Each structure stands twice: as C-alpha cells, then as structure tokens.
Amino acid sequence: MRSHCISKKIAHGGRINAAQVLFPNAPAPWIDLSTGVNPCAYPIPEIVPQAWSRLPDDEAFSSIEDAARIRYNAPLQTRVVAGAGVQSFIQILPRIFPRRRVGILGFTYAEYALTWGASDSVVEIVDTIEQLDKDFDVGIIVNPNNPDGRLVEKGQIAKLAERFAQRNQQLIIDESFIDFYPQFSAVNLTLLDSVIVLRSFGKTYGLPGLRLGFALCSKHNENLLRQALGPWAVSGPALAIGLKALSDPEWINLAAVQCQQDAGRLDELLKDRKSTRLNSSHIPLS
C-alpha cells in the first residue's frame, strides 16, 4: 500500500502534434498507439441545425440517458446521468464526497489521484482489491484497468460493494473500457447508494472529441451529480450523435469483432518482433 498525492499536470496519450515536434524526422504517417480509443470510429450522422442553434432540452437528455441504460443493460430503476465524458465526473466527485480517505486500486488512470489529492483528501494507492476493504470513505476501481487491461471479477466487486453499503462508504467503478466485455460489468449494483458506475462513450465509438460519458447510479446519487454538473452539461450535437450511436446495436457488435481481430493481428506483429506480452487482450466476447 502506498500513500499517493499528485499535484502536477498529467501528460496523457493522443498528443500527436507534441510528438511530431519532439521527433520531426520520424517516418509518416504516425500510428498512434498511445490511447485506448477505437481507431475505427462510428460514422458521423447528419445533425439537424437545431442541435447547434438551440440549448439542449430535457427531452434530449432523457432520450440519450434511456438509450444508455438500455445499451449498458442496467436495471430499469437505475438512474443515468450524461456528462461531457467520464473526466467530467472525475472532476466533480471530490466535491460531492469532500475531504475523504480515498483508496484507489492501482496502478491505474492517474487523474483519480490527482483530482482527489487536490481536494485535500488522503489518497492511498492499493495493490489488491482486498486492500480496498477497509476504512476508506471512497474506493475507486477502474475495470478493465487503464492502461494494462487488468480485470476484476464481477463477484469480487459485488462482495466489496455489499460491505461498502454496510459501512456507508462510496464505491466508484470506472468501466470506460468494458463495452466489449459486459459480463464483467457491475451495472447491476447501481441501485445501491454506495455504488456509482462510470461509462465512456468516446473510447468504444472512436469519438473522444465528442466529450460524452455517463454515470449510472441510484436516485440519491443522481441528484448529487446533476446538481454538481449544472444545466446543459453536454452539447446538443453530442447528444444527437450519441443517441444515434447508442441505438445502433449492429455497429457495436461488428466493432467488437473487428477490434478482437485487430488485437490478434497486433499481438502477432509484436510477437514477430520478439516483444513481451504483459496482458492478454483475448477474452471471449459476450
């Protein structure tokens, strides 16, 4: 177990322009392997002019939130809150649950330690899920993990969530990369006040610039999240494109097969270069 607090800006992947400045003589075109974004993006549909010229209304939000609940196979009573990407929720969660002891299952996406540390919370990075089962006020699991793909079994998370509920603790589960492996998802736990599940839109659909993500939670947590986000938390064009994509099961099924095939091909290419596999991307699709 390690105490951890980050106070500096984090350098994320996907910064092709910065890389080109550092390595101006590198061969082109660049192949960006620095992010977990699907390189085969959902085709942008035609957007009605009103999506640009008007503020998004309540119906636009309720439509996409209903579509997300269905797409993620969440319980009917689960509340869904749309935001400008999962990062928007990461930024506000320390304000909703302030000055807490926060346990993070590491090594993982560093923005969690950064944002909670900046809120004067005491942050500890733990090495196993069992170490989260103690007197933390907030526990955070990224599942599958970013960046190494580590997966925590659904049953382990369910047991931990039950104990968090008994102790009135908060468990945050970031499922930004779980779309192709729904059998590992904890969305069935979102009726508990002690659980918030975060889901990314842009990564799987290859549209991170759209800035769209969702929190799945209980009614109590929905009220807290909406109050913290404020009105019009997502743009009209993002709501329109997201609704179209989430309502297109054929595309997501084909994308899952394509990504699995591409992952296998990449593994073979790297194996030919005598590279070492740190984690397997070959999990049977559900």
Model regions: which residues?
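N-terminal "arm"/small-domain region of PLP-dependent enzymes with the aminotransferase-like
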Residues: M1-A60, A67
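Short, solvent-exposed loop/turn segments at secondary-structure junctions
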Residues: G36-C40, Q87, N145-P147, I178, ...
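Conserved core of the PLP fold type I
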Residues: S53-A165, I172, F177-I196
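A general structural signal for well-ordered alpha-helical segments in protein cores
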Residues: I16, W30, F61-E65, I157, ...
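PLP-dependent aminotransferase class I/II
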Residues: S194-K271, S275
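Residue-level marker for buried hydrophobic side chains located in beta-strands
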Residues: L33, L171-I172
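Short glycine-rich, flexible loops that bind phosphorylated cofactors or substrates
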Residues: P45, E111, P147-G149, Y205, ...
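Single conserved hydrophobic/aromatic residue that forms the stacking wall/gate
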Residues: D272, L278-S286
